[in-house]
A protein has these predicted regions:
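Ser/Thr/Pro-rich, acidic low-complexity intrinsically disordered regulatory segments
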Residues: 1-23, 37-95
Length: 95
């Protein structure tokens, strides 16, 4: 059975395969990864709310980076880039 491709799988795979402890992407790169046919939504270019690390809004891109184990730490709307940091997993919680 073929695995279903989800909307944000491209960004999840890209960040997992190319990110270290931190990765910076331009809005153009995000366009190409997430929205190759339509581009980022206008709200992503106008407000930092679109970039919130929040699973409760599936229409936004958070699924992509959170599922990859990263969070947005910087959004620069003027220069059109985003910085993601790898989420730290604390082993002491499970000892």
């Amino acid at each position: 059975m073929k695995e279903r491709v989800k909307k944000y799988d491209a960004i999840t795979h890209y960040i997992k395969n190319n990110g270290g402890s931190q990765i910076t992407l331009t809005f153009t790169q995000m366009d190409e990864l997430l929205f190759p046919n339509s581009g980022l939504p206008k709200s992503a270019r106008q407000t930092t709310d679109w970039w919130a690390n929040d699973y409760r809004h599936p229409e936004k891109g958070a699924y992509g980076w959170l599922n990859a184990g990263y969070e947005v730490v910087v959004v620069n709307l003027a220069k059109e880039y985003i910085v993601f940091n790898q989420l730290v997993k604390s082993s002491w919680l499970f000892d």
